[in-house]
């Protein structure tokens, strides 16, 4: 080590000091210029789309307002996908090495079919990245303070004012602005299949994962009502493929008493009953809802149903419902905080948006109940709080 140190300190017998300085300058310039040029070249749109796996998304981008618009300002690939700050840019470049690996070595996205299969995963990763830095790339062009709301569409102005007040991340509301949105339903439908396959109906308290017909007697052909998703029942008896159950819920005393709800005054549906099941209900208690001055009765109904689509823990149902919410309501805009609406308010809100989704009736019912059970006036009830709303 001493010899090496002495050699480094000793003047060169072969090279002049000027030559050594010149070499040092050249090396220094190279260390500065080459990475800069490399980053600049690999950040061009031409470089990005040179991989054939990027051609489909490039064609999508060409149809967007970021490619062609009235003002003639074009956002290139790097404008959206590479953070403007140096640490963020370097980090993104290092992460991009995985794209090269997946394309040329793992071959996981090297065909249109493979790319589509991973589109949701790739999109969610990019959304999370943009959410993490508060859409820094978007803000390099767009600024809340620079917006003239008078020149915006009234609805756009209203939404942007709310977003500006909360300093909301752009990606919360503008997913799919430049590329086709992935089909998020594959994720939550796979999750439901796994929930159904792993259903455990042991125990005295069960929860429904689907809309299930209920019967007045074991073996009946005609149903006497329906048990709705995410509803709790008590098992009274097991007989082969049949379960005798006890359903408890609230109904308006002056009404037809065919629908049971989770709480008095809140349209969180548990079950519908009719025929002999309805005729044999017991009234447990009554209460008056102050807001509407209406009397509600707590009823207890006994019925039979076939085994299947029941679980002994509500938490997996809520986890699935959360995927439903994020997989559908985040598609067109930023999903609002669930507690932004009360339980009854969520009915109209969801009805106004459901036409833009591909949810079936079971999914719609499950999602609505999840939202209602976590609403502003019921928050926490979805996680095991049994207290009744009076």
Curated annotation (Swiss-Prot):
Transmembrane segments: 17-37
InterPro entries the UniProt entry points to: Cytochrome_c-type_ET (IPR051174), Membr-bd_4haem_cyt_TorC (IPR009154), Multihaem_cyt_sf (IPR036280), NapC/NirT_cyt_c_N (IPR005126), NapC/NirT_cytc_sf (IPR038266)
Localization in the cell: Cell inner membrane
Binding site for heme 1: 48, 51-52
Posttranslational modification: Binds 5 heme groups per subunit.
GO molecular-function terms, A-Z: electron transfer activity; heme binding; iron ion binding
Binding positions (heme 5): 329, 332-333
Subunit relationships: The N-terminal domain interacts with TorA. The immature C-terminal domain can bind to the N-terminal detector region of TorS.
Reported function: Part of the anaerobic respiratory chain of trimethylamine-N-oxide reductase TorA. Acts by transferring electrons from the membranous menaquinones to TorA. This transfer probably involves an electron transfer pathway from menaquinones to the N-terminal domain of TorC, then from the N-terminus to the C-terminus, and finally to TorA. TorC apocytochrome negatively autoregulates the torCAD operon probably by inhibiting the TorS kinase activity.
Protein name: Cytochrome c-type protein TorC
Organism from which the protein derives: Escherichia coli O157:H7
Name of the encoding gene: torC
